């Protein structure tokens, strides 16, 4: 596993020199390197096209053995996300060369700015270096790669800005990878009790309070909907509450992050196929997202009050498990007809949302969940589906997503959709039928938000990947961590 220790420095003896290179204008302040690049361009072996990587091995007596040219395409077309992805690709070349120290020649992209350019580069390197090898018996020796950062046009006044950008990028990468680790843990080791213990350790490390409620305390709170989902498992449910108060002068303003915490989902009596169950350790991707986000927020001491709530349980089959046709209650008081036990996440979320509002006095709600396959069908694997009752709130999320490169898309929430989740024999039913599954699932949760500003994020697509991306590995991706942090961070400026 590669750990990138990124710091501002002058170019010293390193194994490799990493040069970001634009097609039309990159002037390397080294005649030998410029000559080599010009020869490569004449031979059309390297043009600087976006994503292109070429390695030059030094033959002269020099401290730097390898020069890695990283094509960024046209400077007029570059974005922060393109930078992240390009540098994520560069990790593979660094690994191939077995470089233990790399000097990154860094120049600001004018349209993006010094801090944002550097932050995107560091995130690409740090996020792209992630791997999950905990359970492999033949573990490769952990290699620590030091990346020195410098540029010929960075003056002394900009050094502090660079260091702040690096620190923030490394923290966001660290907490995103924390979320990835939580998702990647197998369900036989990551169940409600162990998740709760892990969150306590995380809270101690990053600086937020953690309170855990056991099954008896959950029952006292009248969270029947949440408890019903977990009844089939011998691993008892836990309600995990995280609190960070960074703005004690405005305690009436509390942003609640509510994450779906199904540490395993078999579908219950509405049983999934074997193929559908294989990745269901990832059904707590929403929980991982809010845990990662509050960790970053607390560590940066942002001036904001945040409550994170996770209703953690397993959805399994037993003689005690809930069944299709059951009618159950909820903490808020509404009754629910169960038509499908595999529509369980929303049942845990509604009690968690009610708890956040009534007990933690949340003024705004964001729930995050791997909720519906319909979200993947409609938007693909890379986009988060969003339902909201306040367009301005969604606007904040959208602007934050532009910064992080995590794609979001607002789904319609016309009033008529709400009719699809009304029951003839209870207040609501837990599925809305054949059509608009992502929308009706979100609106089901919306029935419990008590007129608070609310965002519902369905991350069923981006939370877990079965193919490697440029800076996202296979498995848990940590989707949502950086965007939730960025939304909170923008409110503090």
Swiss-Prot record:
Keywords: Aminopeptidase, Cytoplasm, Hydrolase, Manganese, Metal-binding, Protease. One of its GO terms (molecular function) is manganese ion binding. Its main location: cytoplasm. It holds the Pfam family Peptidase_M17. InterPro entries: Leucine_aapep/pepB, Macro_dom-like, Peptidase_M17_C, Peptidase_M17_leu_NH2_pept, Peptidase_M17_N. It is found in: Cytoplasm. Binds 2 manganese ions per subunit. One of its GO terms (cellular component) is cytoplasm. Its EC number is 3.4.11.1, 3.4.11.10. Its cofactor is Mn(2+). Mn(2+) 1 binds at residues 265, 342, 344. GO terms for biological process: proteolysis. It catalyses: Release of an N-terminal amino acid, Xaa-|-Yaa-, in which Xaa is preferably Leu, but may be other amino acids including Pro although not Arg or Lys, and Yaa may be Pro. Amino acid amides and methyl esters are also readily hydrolyzed, but rates on arylamides are exceedingly low; Release of an N-terminal amino acid, preferentially leucine, but not glutamic or aspartic acids. Mn(2+) 2 binds at residues 260, 265, 283, 344. Presumably involved in the processing and regular turnover of intracellular proteins. Catalyzes the removal of unsubstituted N-terminal amino acids from various peptides. This is Probable cytosol aminopeptidase. It comes from Clostridium perfringens (strain 13 / Type A). The gene is pepA.
